[in-house]
């Protein structure tokens, strides 16, 4: 490296160290070798006789390329910077210093973006997801709180450039919502949203009480991945109870006059899904079946982990013990009860500024 500038040498050493850590965490060498194997497989005529296999291989290839290409580029950029500095002598360093510092910033930015990707190592983190919001104890207050959470998550998803669709929304009798389901489409949507599953508690002076007494409300959030076609879930139609009804808006106003909304109950498990966002009953049924498939698969995975969860002392409980975050508006404080992270900028968080909480949860392996 450059002999006469310790500061530059230290920064390069730090960059190399960060890259090596990322390589280990993201299994760079394994992914790189697997990519070579896939390219060899795709050259075999026999492989192309099986369209389903080609689809599966190409999907895996695209996931590998994303990581391997980024790390390789950062590696090359750092090496190029080292080569440039080694060619320069101390008299010429000032003439290229601005360019060197500019390249440092670009490389550090690329590493930071890749570090975010390294938070998503779960099997389904790369998938899109559904977000269910359900008002809990607290009556009108809880229903208003559920609508605030819906708004918060919609804005956060938009800030991440995800495509969103509110596929079900049941309005409260006075204000707010009783329940809602959001479809969030985009790479790593489930990875970003999954740690939001749990009970969210709101404490505030009630706007619905003449004396503005302090009130505590609860709403639950449940996040589950939208499964791709490669994951099979067998659903027997005889196990389903399908109801159709008219979709209604706030205050009982009908969105349309036909019975296009669909509710499906899976009788063996009691799982209920519903969709009312489209005027087509057929499309709503297809969407509801996608939700049911995702929920059944999630339940299957959870059952496999059940024995391990029983042994854990920190098993989640219903009510107060199930909380993941507390939003205390009159004290201007939002606190994550799992990580201890706090924010006093309440409006920013409720407007979708969740990165502080979510990134900390992901880095803590939640």
Curated annotation (Swiss-Prot):
Output the Gene Ontology terms for molecular function.
Answer: translation release factor activity, codon specific
On whether Plastid is a keyword of this UniProt record, the answer is no
Q: Which GO terms describe its biological process?
A: viral translational frameshifting
Q: Name one GO cellular component term.
A: cytoplasm
What's in the keyword line of the UniProt record?
Cytoplasm, Methylation, Protein biosynthesis
The cross-references to Gene3D superfamilies, in alphabetical order and at most eight, read: 3.30.160.20, 3.30.70.1660, Release factor
Does the record bear Cytoplasm in its keywords? yes
Question: Where along the sequence do coiled-coil regions lie?
Answer: none
Location in or out of the cell: Cytoplasm
* Top-rank lineage group of the source organism: Bacteria
Q: List-wise, which residues carry N5-methylglutamine?
A: 253
Q: How is it modified after translation?
A: Methylated by PrmC. Methylation increases the termination efficiency of RF2.
The UniProt entry, under NCBIfam families, shows: prfB (TIGR00020)
**Biological role:** Peptide chain release factor 2 directs the termination of translation in response to the peptide chain termination codons UGA and UAA.
Q: Which family does it belong to?
A: Belongs to the prokaryotic/mitochondrial release factor family.
Q: Give the miscellaneous note.
A: The gene for this protein contains a UGA in-frame termination codon after Leu-26; a naturally occurring frameshift enables complete translation of RF-2. This provides a mechanism for the protein to regulate its own production.
Put simply, this protein is called Peptide chain release factor 2
Which classification does the entry list for the species? Bacteria, Pseudomonadati, Pseudomonadota, Gammaproteobacteria, Enterobacterales
């Amino acid at each position: 490296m450059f002999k006469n500038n310790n500061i530059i040498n230290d920064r390069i050493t730090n960059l190399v160290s960060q890259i090596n850590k990322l390589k280990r965490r993201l299994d760079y060498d394994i992914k790189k070798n697997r990519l070579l194997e896939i390219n060899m497989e795709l050259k075999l005529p026999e492989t192309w006789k099986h369209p389903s296999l080609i689809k599966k291989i190409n999907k895996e290839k695209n996931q590998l390329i994303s990581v391997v290409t980024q790390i390789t580029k950062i590696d090359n950029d750092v090496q190029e910077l080292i080569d440039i500095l080694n060619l320069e002598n101390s008299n010429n360093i000032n003439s290229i210093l601005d360019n060197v510092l500019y390249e440092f910033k670009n490389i550090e930015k690329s590493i930071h973006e890749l570090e975010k990707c390294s938070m998503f190592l779960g099997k389904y983190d790369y998938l899109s997801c559904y977000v269910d919001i359900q008002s809990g104890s607290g009556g009108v207050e809880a229903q208003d709180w559920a609508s605030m959470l819906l708004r918060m998550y919609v804005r956060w998803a938009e800030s991440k450039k995800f495509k969103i669709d509110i596929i079900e929304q049941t309005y409260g009798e006075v204000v707010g919502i009783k329940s809602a389901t959001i479809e969030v489409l985009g790479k790593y949507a489930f990875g970003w949203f999954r740690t939001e599953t749990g009970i969210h508690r709101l404490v505030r002076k009630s706007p619905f009480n003449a004396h503005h007494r302090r009130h505590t409300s609860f709403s639950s959030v449940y996040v589950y991945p939208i499964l791709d076609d490669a994951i099979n879930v067998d659903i027997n139609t005889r196990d389903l109870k399908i109801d159709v009804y008219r979709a209604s808006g706030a205050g009982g106003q009908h969105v349309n006059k036909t019975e296009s909304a669909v509710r499906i109950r899976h009788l063996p498990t009691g799982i209920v899904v519903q969709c009312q966002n489209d005027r087509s009953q057929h499309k709503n049924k297809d969407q509801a079946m996608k939700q049911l498939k995702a929920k059944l698969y999630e339940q299957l995975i959870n059952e496999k982990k059940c024995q391990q969860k029983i042994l854990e002392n920190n098993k989640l409980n219903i009510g107060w013990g199930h909380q993941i975050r507390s939003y205390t508006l009159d004290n201007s404080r939002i606190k994550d009860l799992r990580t201890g992270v706090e924010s006093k900028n309440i409006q920013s968080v409720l407007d979708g500024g969740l990165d502080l909480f979510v990134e900390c949860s992901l880095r803590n392996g939640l």
